[in-house]
């Protein structure tokens, strides 16, 4: 026990406030890939617009992903935790709907 004397001679105990060491059991959050799916109707320039607007890709990155969508049927926009991935998908789907494009955006567990 650790004791110190205050100004008026009272003793203060330190050990009452010491927390035992505990191991943290925090787990890394699960990550999800956000993917754009190819269709025959959405213009390539709209896909680039979406990638730049919602995924903060520069033109070269957006072009690379757009070509992957076009050639392979799918392109990875980014890897996020669940909440962020879900929000990105909602944003893309709403933007596509407002612009009357059938662009689909999905997530899959990494």
From Swiss-Prot:
Disulfide bonds: none annotated. Pfam families: ClpS. GO terms for biological process: protein catabolic process; proteolysis. Binds to the N-terminal domain of the chaperone ClpA. Belongs to the ClpS family. Involved in the modulation of the specificity of the ClpAP-mediated ATP-dependent protein degradation. This is ATP-dependent Clp protease adapter protein ClpS.
